[in-house]
């Protein structure tokens, strides 16, 4: 959960379990990066109304992906930086195909 000036996480998100898989570790890193990016975009700056919520969430996701490709200890766990972007784009395209989506 992010707030202006503070981000809180549960212990299990920050301290990896011994039996934790690399996929779970990656997901934990993704959540941390996403929530930390909200401190700058989404908390310090915010939308006027709920219609524009997609903007702060998409920017937080973009920052998450960019951070994961720029930090050597994280990026080294992936074959190449494009893998992260392609997985991100694939998720966005699949979400856009749903009947519940609408033009922005």
Describe each PLM feature range.
Residues 1-104:
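Hydrophobic alpha-helical and helix-loop surface patches within well-folded domains
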